[in-house]
Amino acid sequence: MLLAQGTPMLLAGDEFGNTQEGNNNPYCQDNEITWLDWRMTSAKTEILEYVKKLIAFRRKHPVLHQGRELYMFDSLSCGMPDVSIHGTQAWKADFSYYSRMLAVLLYGDYRKKDDGTADDSLYIIFNMYWESRSFDLPNLPGEKEWYPAIETYGNTFSEVPVPVRRKKRRRKPSLESQKKTIVPPRSIVVFVGR
């Protein structure tokens, strides 16, 4: 939800792993199924910290919360549409019944940061298939490159990287030489293009 346009809606307690034991309609119960155990915040710090970092990532990237509808075409004549949908192949969405994979490119030039500069582009890959899949990375205009930002696979949550500072040469490695990336099963991967 934190990567979607609009207002993200989290159920109270989601940020620290609260569960209603599979009950999706517990409004009429006044018992431990609906009570929030705030002590879990100290036991489930990994999830809570990850949600905080996702919120900070969302705030940093205005392309994730645009004030208008997206058109899926190049309305600014900048060479890229504001949003585009992809499959395992770049620019070729697969909407077949059995497809469990989708990638979304949000082009940063369509949303400005507070300082007036264009936001970074984001490439969000959803692999809900039960096996790893290879995804093409779309080419970015100019000298922009893809950098890994968020990964949701494995038993732990990866850290969102420290922002790249252009003055320092030490930075997270880009994927400039890669045209593809492998995404593990049932996971989401986000790349930042700058």
Language model feature labels by segment:
Residues 2-10, 14-194:
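Carbohydrate-interacting/catalytic domains
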